[in-house]
Amino acid sequence: PIDGLLRKMVHVPGRLFSVAQWTVRNIPRLFARNERLICLFSTDAGPIVMVLVGAINVAAIETVWSGLVTPPRGKRITDFDYADTKKTYQKGEEMGRFNMGSTVILLTPPNVEWLSKFRAGQVVRVGEAIGSFTKKKNVL
């Protein structure tokens, strides 16, 4: 959503509950229980965290920098340090994909003004604007 430098990636194994609205409402802490790939970036607007959440029917999570990310044996959390690799990505550039589709959670600094047209659970397409930073006018 913004130009950034990849600092770290953490794979957290977990369940693969559906991320359909009914399931999200009825399974406590679903997004914290499902498999996740947490990607930390440094940006001009501050740190950005992109969390790719696995789900049922998601064949795999894949990133452009590491390829297919598969759960390790023993369900251990796997930490990947990219601090010294200078892996930079431009706004709008592909970061990763679900090989069936799922959910992305984006954590940003507090200086984001979200577009009012978006509602919880709404589908967002690649390249679609979702907001802007209030101090520096970068469109997310």
What role is predicted for each listed range?
Residues 1-140:
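Contiguous, well-folded functional domains in the mature portion of proteins
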